């Protein structure tokens, strides 16, 4: 991974702390840049400035609108993880990305542990969470329900002490569309990390951690993860959720 590290803020110590924590090294020839401004940490694709910057923002914008006016319990992901009545499962989001799916679940009431293996994305996610924790409206429930795990792979979680009702997987999968048709965040992500070619390896540790079910989000054209057919699937317009029930749930 190559990336430029740029500090546009007045807080040099914070910038250095981010670089050291996530073990990031500056490469002046890279076309992607991680930039700290006075308000947030953001990712820019320098050779495609029109794409704009990518940052994690739980407080306002799209996610705030989705929290206030979205489908809530009617959202496809809420149904997939099994939210029903008073039942709000604990969830490990093993491919957290920018935390959007996790935020939907947390806003409904689930406690979500986030795991993100790419250091740049994890840094963006941590920055977004830190700002959300300080917000007067959502700060309290965010601190209670959304936490970034101090690991970069779910295989590093202890199955005896860090299990959850549900493990959620949404691995990057190659898009059929030409790049110009793929939304900007996905284009930048693919440039940064590519597809999760080792995604099949996620399923076994996910099953070990999930006490009730593993939920895998897949494009409608993608095969099942690790060629293991799910217990059942829930389909949406362009995707499906493959659901693997734990042995105890099948009885």
Curated annotation (Swiss-Prot):
E.C. number(s) listed in UniProt: 2.1.1.242
Catalytic activity entry: guanosine(1516) in 16S rRNA + S-adenosyl-L-methionine = N(2)-methylguanosine(1516) in 16S rRNA + S-adenosyl-L-homocysteine + H(+)
Pfam family, one: SAM_MT
Sorted UniProt keywords: Cytoplasm, Methyltransferase, rRNA processing, S-adenosyl-L-methionine, Transferase
Keyword Ubl conjugation tagged: no
Binding-site list for S-adenosyl-L-methionine: 100-101, 116-117, 170
Keyword Transferase: yes
GO CC, any one term: cytoplasm
Location (main, coarse): cytoplasm
Subcellular location: Cytoplasm
GO molecular function, one term: rRNA (guanine-N2-)-methyltransferase activity
Role played: Specifically methylates the guanosine in position 1516 of 16S rRNA.
Recorded family membership: Belongs to the methyltransferase superfamily. RsmJ family.
Cross-referenced HAMAP family: 16SrRNA_methyltr_J (MF_01523)
This protein's name: Ribosomal RNA small subunit methyltransferase J
């Amino acid at each position: 991974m190559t990336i430029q590290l740029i500090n546009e803020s007045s807080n040099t110590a914070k910038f250095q702390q981010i670089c050291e924590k996530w073990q990031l090294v500056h490469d002046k020839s890279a076309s992607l840049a991680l930039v700290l401004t006075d308000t947030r940490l953001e990712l820019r694709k320098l050779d495609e400035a029109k794409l704009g910057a990518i940052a994690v923002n739980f407080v306002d914008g799209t996610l705030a609108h989705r929290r206030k006016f979205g489908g809530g319990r009617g959202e496809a992901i809420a149904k997939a993880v099994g939210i029903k009545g008073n039942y709000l499962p604990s969830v490990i989001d093993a491919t957290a990305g920018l935390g959007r799916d996790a935020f939907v679940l947390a806003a409904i009431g689930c406690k979500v542990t986030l795991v993100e293996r790419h250091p740049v994305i994890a840094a963006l996610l941590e920055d977004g969470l830190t700002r959300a924790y300080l917000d007067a409206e959502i700060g309290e429930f965010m601190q209670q329900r959304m936490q970034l795990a101090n690991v970069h792979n779910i295989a590093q979680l202890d199955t005896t002490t860090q299990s959850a009702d549900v493990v959620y997987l949404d691995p990057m999968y190659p898009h059929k569309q030409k790049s110009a048709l793929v939304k900007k965040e996905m284009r930048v992500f693919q440039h940064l990390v590519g597809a999760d070619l080792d995604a099949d390896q996620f399923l076994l540790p996910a099953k070990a951690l999930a006490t009730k079910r593993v939920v895998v989000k897949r494009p409608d054209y993608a095969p099942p993860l690790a060629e293991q057919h799910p217990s059942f699937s829930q389909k949406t317009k362009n995707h499906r959720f493959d659901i693997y029930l734990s042995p105890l749930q099948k009885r």
